Amino acid sequence: YLAESGRPGPVVIDIPKDMTMPNQKFPYIYPERIKMRSYNPVKKGHSGQIRKAVTLMMQAKKPVIYAGGGVILGRASDELTKMAHLLNFPVTNTLMGLGCFPGTDEQFIGMLGMHGTYESNMAMHNADLIIAIGARLDDRVTNKVSKFCPDAKLIHIDIDPTTISKHIAAD
């Protein structure tokens, strides 16, 4: 349940050592009701932020869509592809985002970051707008934050609101 709710991912189950001892007997009393804790982030966009994002997209001359593993986890690959085609913006992926946008699509410019392609890294560096979707903007992509996409505005879209502006402030 926890691994699949909110922001899906691995879960640690920590069992105390004494519970695994073969000679110990621990009576377990089942509760009448169980309340499962989970992480349920707000999934509805803020209308003011959406309007601001649309304005930035309309003004952009050199935009790039930067898609990460969150697109795959969120099962949003089809929506990403439709959006990229509608806007006619180039798309780059992180390593964890590979496969969320067709690699054979003419708008795909390759993987970015320290192990990415020259073309995708230069497109990002020279962009005036970055639309980061399901991406953490971690150091594998940004390297030195102060020099990352120096002339670009940033739209950051993520299912986890605590990820937005965590490493780089979104506009």
Listing of model-derived features with the role each one plays in the protein:
Residues 15-21, 69-71, 137, 161:
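Glycine-rich beta-alpha junction loops
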Residues 45-46, 52-130:
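Anionic-ligand anchoring segments at beta-strand to alpha-helix junctions in alpha/beta enzyme folds, i.e.
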